UniProtKB/Swiss-Prot annotation:
Ranges annotated as biased composition (Polar residues): 225-236, 317-332, 346-361
All copies of domain LisH, residue ranges: 18-50
Modified residues (Phosphoserine): 321
GO cellular component, one term: nucleus
Entry's localization field: Nucleus
Species classification: Eukaryota, Metazoa, Chordata, Craniata, Vertebrata
Renumbered residue ranges of the record's region Disordered: 147-171, 194-361
A Gene Ontology molecular function term of the record: single-stranded DNA binding
Protein name per its UniProtKB record: Single-stranded DNA-binding protein 2
Organism: Mus musculus
Length: 361
């Protein structure tokens, strides 16, 4: 506990200093109690050669012992059988009341488990692959700013931005606001092109949270070599900017397959992975699958790049069912209906398509 070899320091006494002090106090005690012969014998036997300066009677050793004995007798287990002072008893009582708990004494609140009740799904950063029940969010692509749509939900749930959480009444845990992951490009321009009609306001039933895909004003992803590249908006998770205009005829693919792209190596990410996920092409499971809101977000590719989406046109959105939300592929585009999450925004594996508003790929 103490440093050794520092005999010149009074703050940190060495073992030799402690022994000298104790011998001095013993000699002093013997003299004060009248045992002078014993005191001289004691000094000669320990071969004391230094000068001794005695303190006032009764001496330090005697005073120290009296204080120790009083406190020793006032301990709770001995105070009934030993005499002690009221000061010693009060000292023990105060020390016992102020002593911290041996288990939780030094643990500040907030360390370990959170204070208060833990909400359901607190330890679930992502939703489970299948979520039975619960509302299914409609797909909203309004021609207005994100702030003007009340009750809009982020396109992708949970786990990416811990600085902000948005709870959902029917989800298992907090839905967290996030920035779009790699593989996501924005949807929906600020003004629709000549052949692109503004889509319906909602695809689901009443009371369902909408996924806003309004125009965004974030930082554009730099791609000076391609005029058709899509700005990558990072201002808000639901704030997506789409291709600048587009005057193609109806039926023009808004998202061409990788074979139709002419700049697949540019610094832009494709909206979806047209090729079904394989062992070397990781899925990005973001939604509940065939029973929940966003099971079709699993096919987003996080590695391949494609900056051209062509002169997009929205054909129609299926209105057969509030839960029928899908994108159909053009002939010749690879498609995997058997694997959930293979197609973007196809959470329910619908086989019925209506001519009203199905987005083409």
């Amino acid at each position: 506990m103490y440093g050794k070899g520092k005999s010149n320091s009074s703050a940190v006494p060495s073992d030799s200093q402690a022994r000298e002090k104790l011998a001095l106090y013993v000699y002093e005690y013997l003299l004060h109690v009248g045992a002078q012969k014993s005191a001289q014998t004691f000094l000669s036997e320990i071969r004391w050669e230094k000068n001794i300066t005695l303190g006032e009677p009764p001496g330090f050793l005697h005073s120290w012992w009296c204080v120790f004995w009083d406190l020793y007798c006032a301990a709770p287990e001995r105070r009934e059988t030993c005499e002690h002072s009221s000061e010693a008893k009060a000292f023990h009582d105060y020390s016992a009341a102020a002593a911290p708990s041996p288990v939780l004494g030094n643990m500040p609140p907030g360390d370990g488990m959170p204070v208060g009740p833990v909400p359901p799904g607190f330890f679930q950063p992502f939703m489970s692959p299948r979520y039975p029940g619960g509302p299914r969010p409609p797909l909203r692509i309004p021609n207005q700013a994100l702030g003007g749509v009340p009750g809009s939900q982020p396109l992708l749930p949970s786990g990416m931005d811990p600085t902000r959480q948005q709870g959902h009444p029917n989800m298992g845990g907090p839905m967290q606001r996030m920035t779009p992951p790699r593989g996501m490009v924005p949807l929906g321009p600020q003004n629709y092109g000549g052949a692109m009609r503004p889509p319906l306001n909602a695809l689901g039933g009443p009371g369902m949270p909408g996924m806003n895909m309004g125009p965004g004003g974030g930082r554009p992803w730099p791609n000076p070599t391609n005029a058709n590249s899509i700005p990558y908006s990072s201002a808000s998770p639901g704030n997506y900017v789409g291709p600048p205009g587009g005057g193609g005829p109806p039926g023009t693919p808004i998202m061409p397959s990788p074979a139709d792209s002419t700049n697949s190596g540019d610094n832009m990410y494709t909206l979806m992975n047209a090729v079904p996920p394989g062992p070397n092409r990781p899925n990005f499971p973001m939604g509940p699958g065939s029973d929940g809101p966003m099971g079709g977000l699993g096919g987003m590719e996080s590695h391949h790049m494609n900056g051209s989406l062509g002169s997009g046109d929205m054909d129609s959105i299926s209105k057969n069912s509030p839960n029928n939300m899908s994108l159909s592929n053009q002939p010749g585009t690879p498609r995997d209906d058997g694997e959930m999450g293979g197609n973007f925004l196809n959470p329910f594996q619908s086989e019925s398509y209506s001519p009203s508003m199905t987005m083409s790929v």
